[in-house]
């Protein structure tokens, strides 16, 4: 019983000692920061987590399996293909030829690639030429 009386007395003392910002400013003190008692809609929204970029992830589209990956301007035959298709690519850009998307990484036959696995920025002519390719390792 004594414990309950002490708790009630402490709660009453805490409630009495709370002063308003108007009282603080009247005494020449700065106002206290506002207390947020309820969450804002932004606080209560479900937070999404960004996907990882490692381990076979590709942010620009599906992972591609290309038979040939070469640098434009390196006399590798890719330049002739780009010219025939009427595509203008800056010198030094990685270009993949004869590419097909890899649908399911790590499961079944969809993850098999006998060429080079790449992540490309631009897919032209239905996989015949992929521009802006970067080799990736599916085993990472």
Swiss-Prot record:
The signal peptide, as residue positions, is: 1-18
Q: Which cysteines are joined by disulfide bonds?
A: 58-119, 65-113, 66-99, 120-133
Question: Which keywords accompany this UniProt record?
Answer: Cell wall, Disulfide bond, Secreted, Signal
Q: Name one GO cellular component term.
A: fungal-type cell wall
SMART domains registered for this protein in UniProt: HYDRO
Spans annotated as Disordered: 22-60
Q: What induces it?
A: Expression is not regulated by ammonium and glucose concentrations. The introns present in the gene are required for the proper heterologous expression in the ectomycorrhizal basidiomycete Hebeloma cylindrosporum.
Q: Which Pfam families match?
A: Hydrophobin
Q: Where in the cell is it found?
A: Secreted; Secreted, Cell wall
Q: Name one GO molecular function term.
A: structural constituent of cell wall
The yes or no answer to whether the keyword Disulfide bond is present is yes
The subunit structure is: Self-assembles to form functional amyloid fibrils called rodlets. Self-assembly into fibrillar rodlets occurs spontaneously at hydrophobic:hydrophilic interfaces and the rodlets further associate laterally to form amphipathic monolayers.
Q: Quote the function comment for this protein.
A: Aerial growth, conidiation, and dispersal of filamentous fungi in the environment rely upon a capability of their secreting small amphipathic proteins called hydrophobins (HPBs) with low sequence identity. Class I can self-assemble into an outermost layer of rodlet bundles on aerial cell surfaces, conferring cellular hydrophobicity that supports fungal growth, development and dispersal; whereas Class II form highly ordered films at water-air interfaces through intermolecular interactions but contribute nothing to the rodlet structure.
Family according to the record: Belongs to the fungal hydrophobin family.
Please identify the protein, giving its name as recorded.
Class I hydrophobin 1
| Originating organism | Pisolithus tinctorius
Q: Which gene encodes it?
A: hydPt-1
